[in-house]
From Swiss-Prot:
Residues 8-288 form the tr-type G domain. Keywords: Cytoplasm, Elongation factor, GTP-binding, Nucleotide-binding, Protein biosynthesis. One of its GO terms (molecular function) is GTPase activity. This is Elongation factor G. Belongs to the TRAFAC class translation factor GTPase superfamily. Classic translation factor GTPase family. EF-G/EF-2 subfamily. GTP binds at residues 17-24, 86-90, 140-143. It comes from Chelativorans sp. (strain BNC1).
């Protein structure tokens, strides 16, 4: 079966937005007008086709990115293939957004015409900047009370530091929003309300908008001709570029991320969606318009590029794993080069394992079709892969490549979790492992000391949703504990302990004497053991017993029972008995010596210190710094990033719980932060006493 669409007719794009900017409604309308879904689903009644997880229907926020294939005839009547990736808009799911941005070629950024650039818009915009994604802007909800297109244009500049090139002007606003003025063709499009927005009339620009339209068209042309010296010279000599030339130049500027074409409409009222689809064809890149993906040769580690061509060796990136109730586990992959055929065996170069390709599916929001082949530029869902997780590369085993890995932040919050009924323990383990395979920012481990299952993630909402999904998808109900900090203990001074263990009551007894020096390990956090026995006061075969005895109590320190770090122990002398001594006797003696020694060597409590980075608009810098100081934080410095300020600090993890809520309210939700573990540091004595009371 040959390729149906040329690769230049593909558009792989996503829709990125703040929570309530109308992303799902816009996607729905796109699916409706491109003829894939017949009844328009409304988020208000929770039936949108893209929002297919139950929870999303309840919360009205989109959590998992689903990939949908649909088709659109451009203004030249030629059919194009759209692969639309739905992205979440909630701050705890920015990992999902990063993941989708990684495999997109372009994006539509939605704004709410009433709110303009909102906090999450800033976050997602910065992530798209990181991956250099070409974008268009759609100012949605023009029918809403308080809608103001011109203010939104201004906010794109002031808050995002980005250049918007206005392509359309609204005709009316709020309940009077009738249509748009196309600044390229200088015509007005007025939608017919009675046709659900499927039909519109092209008319002359109303007299009262004529002057404004002329002014904005001039700005549009000035931005366009900047893209080409020849066009610029002709323009300066008084020659106007043609309509085709304007579109070609705007396309060039968009793909090179020099500026962002801006449109307006109301997806809910079905106005402005079709011109937006034409703009996707006109201005967003196809897979061959963007730089080839870079990777390294899996054998030689030499850098290589893979071009978006069917003739190149097959390479693809797994960017999403989801559980489908009918098919089981589905791995969504973006094919960057080559052709994928059902039944072939591929190399997972990150894991060093082989995978056989069984079922291949083309996904619509919640229906699916089986396919036999897929090509460069396609996004496919593969059923039944065993080893592959998010961010892995799958490729031709004869030409192995590792495409650039995605980076996922370390989880920052952990809680203990247990099933409500003992019998569900195994089921819970399976559920958590399955969820961890889907989501690299979520981790599961067992606490060695308490035997409890600990789950860790990106934030409190993130873990709430995990617990919720466990209940819905795996029918396991769980109780969760309070968020916990992983403290440690160490020693600060040198102490010499001489300890004799003696138990002689008829028959064979037990005898061992040890003299051990305990001191801080100068080389770091590990445990170091040395024996300086000369002249056989402790026979060689008993020395390992001394080391084992000390190691067995390192997991529980003297202050509050936390694991100990950075201890050095040196066995300097001892004594034994021909009959009563044994390895076990020396183990017991060493254990007791360490318990005594840890107390005398100035035991100290340590806490994890996190490296915190807060990105905030300038007006909140003072509040952010004051708040971090109040959390025992040490400010390391600040720098400008675009129109925002980055504040770096070291803060104890214990003082960072609920930080996200505080930061949101402090900055009206416009600042965001990341944090990761940096090092351990002694706990101030007042705080240490409280911890000791709590855990001792």
């Amino acid at each position: 079966m040959a390729r149906e669409f040329k690769i230049e007719d593909y558009r792989n794009f996503g829709i990125m937005a703040h929570i309530d900017a109308g992303k799902t409604t816009t996607t729905e309308r796109i699916l409706y007008y491109t003829g894939k879904s017949h009844k328009i689903g409304e988020v208000h009644d929770g039936a949108a086709t893209m929002d297919w997880m139950e929870q999303e229907q309840e919360r009205g926020i989109t959590i998992t990115s689903a990939a949908t294939t649909t088709f659109w005839k451009g203004r030249d009547e030629k059919l194009r293939r759209f692969n639309i990736i739905d992205t979440p808009g909630h701050v705890d799911f920015t990992i999902e957004v990063e993941r989708s941005l990684r495999v997109l070629d372009g994006a539509i950024a939605l704004l709410d015409a009433n709110a303009g650039v909102e906090p999450q818009t800033e976050t997602v915009w910065r992530q798209a900047d990181k991956y250099h994604v070409p974008r268009m802007i759609f100012c949605n909800k023009m029918d809403k009370i308080g809608a103001d297109f011109y203010r939104s244009v201004e906010m794109v500049k002031s808050r995002l530091g980005a250049t918007a090139v206005v392509m359309q002007l609204p005709i009316g606003a709020e309940s009077d929003f009738k249509g748009v003025i196309d600044l390229v063709e200088m015509k007005a499009l007025i939608w017919r309300d009675e046709t659900l927005g499927a039909a519109w009339d092209v008319v002359e620009i109303p007299a009262e908008f004529k002057e404004k339209a002329e002014e904005y068209r001039e700005k549009l042309i000035e931005a366009a001709v900047e893209m080409d010296e020849g066009a610029m010279e002709r323009y300066l000599e008084g020659e106007m570029p043609s309509i085709e030339e304007i579109r070609a130049l705007v396309r060039k500027g968009t793909i090179e991320v020099k500026f962002f074409p801006m449109f307006c409409g109301s997806a809910f009222k079905n106005k402005g969606v079709q011109p937006l689809l034409d703009a996707v064809v006109d201005f967003l890149p196809s897979p061959i318009d963007i730089p080839a993906i870079k990777g390294v040769d899996a054998k030689t580690e030499e850098p290589i590029e893979r071009h978006a061509e069917d003739s190149e060796p097959l390479s693809m990136l797994a960017f999403k794993i989801m559980n489908d109730p009918f098919v089981g586990s589905l791995t969504f992959c973006r094919i960057y080069s080559g052709v994928l055929k059902k039944g072939v065996s591929l190399e997972n170069t990150v894991k060093g394992k082989r995978e056989r390709i069984g079922r291949m599916l083309q996904m619509h929001a919640n229906s699916r079709e089986d396919i036999e082949e897929a090509y460069a530029g396609d996004i496919v869902a593969l059923a039944g892969l065993k080893e592959t997780t998010t961010g892995d590369t799958l490729c031709d085993p004869l030409k192995p490549v590792i495409l650039e890995r995605m980076e996922f932040p370390e989880p920052v919050i952990q809680i203990a979790i247990e099933p409500k009924t003992k019998g569900d323990q195994e089921k819970m383990g399976l559920a958590l492992n399955r969820l961890a395979a889907e989501d690299p920012s979520f981790r599961v481990k067992t606490d060695e000391e308490s035997g409890q299952t600990i789950i860790a993630g990106m934030g409190e909402l993130h873990l709430d949703i995990i617990v919720d999904r466990m209940k819905r998808e795996f029918k396991v109900e769980a109780n969760i504990g309070a968020p916990q900090v992983a403290y440690r203990e160490t020693i600060t001074k040198t102490a010499e302990i001489d300890y004799t263990h003696k138990k002689q009551t008829g028959g064979s007894g037990q005898f061992a004497r040890v003299k051990i020096v305990f001191e801080p390990n100068p080389d770091g956090e590990d445990f170091l053991f040395e024996s300086k026995i000369v002249g056989g006061s402790v026979p060689k075969e008993y020395v390992p017993g001394v080391q084992k005895g000390i190691e067995s109590v390192l997991s529980s320190g003297p202050i509050a029972g936390f694991p100990m770090l950075g201890v050095k122990a040196t066995l300097v002398d001892g004594a034994y008995h021909d009959v009563d001594s044994s390895v076990l006797a020396f183990e017991i003696a060493a254990r007791a010596a360490f318990r005594e020694g840890a107390q005398k060597a100035g035991a100290q409590l340590l806490e994890p210190i996190m490296k915190v980075e807060v990105v905030t608009p300038e007006e909140y810098v003072g509040s952010v710094i004051g708040d971090l100081n109040s959390r025992r934080g040490q400010i390391q410095g600040q720098e400008a990033r675009g129109v925002a300020v980055v504040v770096n600090a070291m803060v104890p993890l214990a003082n960072m719980f609920k930080y996200v809520d505080n930061l949101r309210s402090m900055s009206q939700g416009r600042a965001q932060y990341t944090m990761q573990f940096d090092h351990y540091e002694p706990v101030p004595s007042a705080v240490a006493q409280e911890i000791q009371k709590k855990f001792a």
